[in-house]
Amino acid sequence: TCEKATFNIIGKSGEDFSYLPQIERSDSILLSQFTLKEVIRQTIFSIADNFTNKILTGELFEINGNLLKVVSSDGLRISLRRIELKNTYPDKKVIVPGKTLNEISKILSGDADKDVNLFFTDKHILFEFDNTTVVSRLIEGEYLKIDNILSADYETKVKINKREFLSCIDLSLIHISE
């Protein structure tokens, strides 16, 4: 028992903290949690981790009709993932901070039967899924023009079986280590 003990708890008024911005919940982009989690997993590794170029610390989310293109780059590597959406949406380009995507990836269940709604304003993105709402500021600026870097007119194009190729790489790594 505490009987005569007294405690002083120091706190701040709720008015000292900023409120979440009001984001109109119309025209949402709908994705499955599994798809969003996979897209983040497949692109997050090539985000720049320094602040010399703030734009490269985020990922470009570009919507053209029923196609979502997610791009990240650290200046040396480029990750590009295209997803065909179920519906058609107005064209939009935003740069989502990598830290936000990393946190989203941790709390998504990855269930293919559950959806995520993405809402955009000029300065914010809102992720809404299950009973969770995440709001983040967008990175302002123009992302790299990836289409200029990755042209489609290659002199040589090779199509390979991914599993066989990875198996050969694993085998060569065994020989190298010996």
Provide a role label for each language-model segment.
Residues 1-177:
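Structural preference for solvent-exposed beta-strand-turn elements
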